[in-house]
Amino acid sequence: MSEAIKNRYEFVILFDVENGNPNGDPDAGNMPRVDPETGLGLVTDVCLKRKIRNYVETVKEDATGYRIYIKDGVPLNRSDAEAYAALDVTEKTVKAKKKENPDLDRNIRDWMCANFFDIRTFGAVMTTFVKAALNCGQVRGPVQMGFARSVEPVVPQEVTITRVAITTEADAENKGTEMGRKYIVPYGLYRCEGYISANLARKTTGFSEKDLELLWEAILNLFEHDHSAARGKMAVRELIIFKHDSELGCAPAHKLFDTVKVTRTHPEDITPARSYQDYVVTVDEAALPEGVTCEIRQ
């Protein structure tokens, strides 16, 4: 495994949606998620991490060290069993093996981190190991992300659609078309903030510089292999990276996030934004604390 990263990072992702549903809420008929008090649109961290996993799986294709643990339709205990097999352990013998080898917990954790990119990055709860009373069942990952929130309120719209195809023979006799509906956000610019702990990378998962570059690549291409009619047009517009010159960091994260401002290109224009060109993104680099540098990727 490569050497773990040595610097703490924070980052800001700015992405937008045009005539699409960035993250439907199953409790609200799959409407776009909205903060009911402010009208600001929301996209969950789980949604964004899923897209990062999907990108890595697409470009790495299960290459050694870059497999994905949390996959659609794949039982987690199937991957857990691989760790047992690699260390010559079974569910029946695990407790006896643990008495023989006090480092068994760490060995299993290290094997999972070395083989699965998303565990090394985001951490995981591995139920098989929790049930076996192993301390490696919960791994806290060095990369953490919050909810994305739109810069301005969004107004989701319900669009009625028709379908010429008929489902049953009875429907064919009674009607010519079927009705459906879909939800869209006409336009929204979303901001997500994230954190990368070099301390956790060193102590726990071994998240490396190579992993870090893959993470940045995945974020910049978050929606490039995820297009669908439901999501409309989505794109990552900017990735703003703050790098500390130490493992534990040189300043609180909120002070760095506060240097990133998103304002209207024409402040006097009160009409709803409909494109990225309606906004201006600035970073007050002069206000950055000593020991912190900023990089902007697009």
Predicted stretch roles:
Residues M1-Q298:
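RNA-binding basic/glycine-rich loop and surface signature characteristic of RAMP-family CRISPR effectors
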